[in-house]
Amino acid sequence: MPQFNGFKIVPKVQIDDKDVLSLVYTPGVGACCQAIAKNLESAKIYTNKINSVAVVAFDYAAALKRAIFLKSALLIDAYPLVISDETDKNDFKFAIENLEINFCAFDLSLIEDYAKDIDFNVEIPVLKGSVADLKDFFGAISRNVFMLDIKSLKGTVQERSLQLHELSGGAIETELTEEKRNKPVAIVSDGTAVLGFGNIGALASIPVMEGKAALYADFADVDAFPFCVKTQKSEEIVKIVEMFADSFSGIHLEDISAPSCFEVENKLSENLNIPVFHDDQHGTAIIVLAGLLNSLVLTGKEISNIKIVISGAGAAGTAVAKLLHFAGAKNIVMTDINGVVYKGREQNDKYLEELAQITNPSDERGELKDVIKNADVFIGLSKGGILKPEMIKEMEYQPVVFALANPEPEIMPDIAKEAGVYIISTGRSDFENQINNSLAFPGLFKGLLEGKVNKVTDEIKLECALMIASMVEEDELSTDNILPDALDCSVPVQIARVIKEKFGS
């Protein structure tokens, strides 16, 4: 009989080709998000919520022991969560009510005396004391024991993703291990900026978070699970994450809209002694820079001499502009729903005004169609269909277009090529030249954790981008191949290595 000392997160389906990746992650996973947004009860069908239990304790070792027992005895995917015994009970009540969307039950039996007089307003069971037969309490939880043939799924990517998630009951589960492992990473979202759907709520965002967790597990052997919150107030998100921070080895922020995402990341980075990383910002920026560096090799241009137009000044667009500027870009022009971003613009908040200080050096005005003229590079982080063929024809020789809106890019690749684009990339795994964060965040967090690095700096992001770009061999680099394959398992290993070597303690 093995002696279990920990658990790891594992994908329910092995991500071994791009087709499976497109079902577990983008673009297919968006169909699951939309289905849940229309019918919240369907989260029980398309995610692992129905078999996920939170075990709360004052001590991580005690919570872990309980989680191991629940998995070994009842096949329940139990996640240890730790709070301080000095936590205000009203704050704890608020946190539990926000976190219920992730789980089918809370096990508070290890903090029975603390929790017994708290009246939780939740729709799922809360176990406050011991019970004679745990199966009576957890008996309604369904299990998914199956043999799934991916090739048997029929229909579009979206239809097959729905089928896959329904058959597997979500994308992840826990597996007991004999070795001790790092605490997991929390994938935190409020659901305000999910893929290209906008604010569809935290519950509907869970399929994306499970997909991220599956990629962490498969590509980097990093344990992570969804920690989504109902509240959409930045100060409340921070409060909840800080309350449970001792449960985690790192915080991965995902699909939180601007400017809230900046406030949440800044505050958590200041207050916590573990890495905090907003993937929509920095994962995107790293991959865009890597792709741009290799594109410039092909065009023979220098980053300091080109004009870059970025459509979308939200979380991703802001981070991309800042990292490109850090890497040497001198002429970046940003556009958003109000047109070109410039200093002193009436619609600027403090973050856009800060961005205006390092962009638009010629003080251009107007809209996207005005500033795209003579641009060498277009980077779309906005919405589908906004880049028109006639705009491409006004760009410089050998134009580079990164149309990264999901699920519909700013322009479809075939249309872009007909208009004269030299290099076209999208965020989708079903097209060539995918620019996707999945190349960056698994290895980045692996390196941060193994190197005991607690802060993500611009220097780290630049090194990650340089490493990713360098992994496309010179004889393999082409207009249709500017980045390593999304399933290249050597990428996260090399990213982790460079972080540990250059920044590790």
For the regions a language model picked out, list residue spans one by one.
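Rossmann-like adenosine-cofactor binding region
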Residues: 353-423, 428-430
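Adenosine-phosphate binding glycine-rich loop
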Residues: 85, 275, 279-280, 299-301, ...
